[in-house]
Amino acid sequence: MSNLGYSFVPVHPGEIIKEELQSRGISQKRLAEVVGVSYTMLNDILNGRRPVSTDFALLIEAATDINAELLVNMQTRYNMQIARKDKNVMAHLENLRKICATLL
């Protein structure tokens, strides 16, 4: 049921931001300075090692005009995909479904 018959693979929103910076010729260091975050934080986000928060998405929207809601929604879809690939999470959910099925 989690597949729903299609194979859409969510992209970390950092990839979109990274591509936009490259197309505009803006360095990560410069963007970090402009929006007021550390270079390390920005680099981690752009490389998918850190999630995009709502606050960060708003900063990026102000700086680049990339829609903040789009970035946050992308992050949510990405997080869901990661959770669905986690065998421990899925085993816990399956166990929970079995328990709840006996209660209802």
Can you say where each PLM-predicted feature lies in the sequence?
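A short, Lys/Arg-rich alpha-helix, primarily the initiator
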Residues: S2-I26
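Residues in the recognition helix of alpha-helical DNA-binding motifs
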Residues: E20, V34, I45-G48, M74
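The alpha-helix within a helix-turn-helix
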Residues: L21, A32, E61
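Short alpha-helical DNA-recognition segment
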Residues: I26-D44
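Short, charged recognition helix plus adjacent turn
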Residues: V72-L104
